[in-house]
Amino acid sequence: MSKVYMMVTITNRNKRKDFRTFFKEHGLPVFLETTGRGTAQSEVLDYFGLEESEKLLFLAIVTGETWKKLRRGLITKMMIDVPGTGVSFIVPLSSVGGRKTLQFLVNEQEFEKEEETAMKDTDYELLVAIANQGYIDTVMDAARAAKAGGGTVIHAKGTGMELAKKYLGVSLVEEKEVILIVTKSREKNLSLIHISEPTRH
């Protein structure tokens, strides 16, 4: 049985090509990327002799085994543990909406589906919906129908979208909207169903 996680990697924007190559070489062709900026105070940057720089954020779905391999490479090859290089971590997922979607996201990683897990002692959970441009209102209307509140939208670019045809039977554009919605744990499954249904058509 395999557990799945969302891997978050944050690094400087000028490292985009290096990290894209690294992920693909390590069997991770499907990921999202977006930009941000650091919030370190200027005196901290001055102390370490650093300049404020734009950040690059990568999001990918990985299995526990894939994370172990990636983590080793991130340290030995990408030097992620060197201060100022970046950070990479994983967040456990309790479920993914749809078998084919899961197959697409984990792609060629070794994976055996296990039962959905309940997050213990949590009143709220974070729903991450990935949609094509122009579908934000569709996703949010569906989420609100399941009693979810507002959401936060991040514009991102998807890599590996050509693999969608293999798993989902449709082509996906690279430009994506990532919608983050905090929902009550007991209403999470209903939100997933509401969001998944209208966005399939």
What do the PLM-derived regions correspond to, one by one?
Residues 1-16, 110-176, 182-184:
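Surface-exposed interaction/gating patches
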Residues 50-66, 173-180:
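Short, structured active-site "lid" loops
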Residues 193-201:
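Residue-level detector of conserved catalytic or cofactor/ligand-binding positions
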Residues 58-59, 66-67, 79, 145, ...:
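Predominantly single-stranded RNA-binding modules in RNA-associated proteins
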Residues 3, 17-54, 71-85, 149-175, ...:
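A cross-kingdom feature marking solvent-exposed beta-strand/loop segments within repeated
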Residues 8, 32, 59:
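Short, conserved beta-strand segments within well-ordered enzyme catalytic domains
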Residues 1-14, 63, 68-72, 76-79, ...:
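Intrinsic disorder/low-complexity detector
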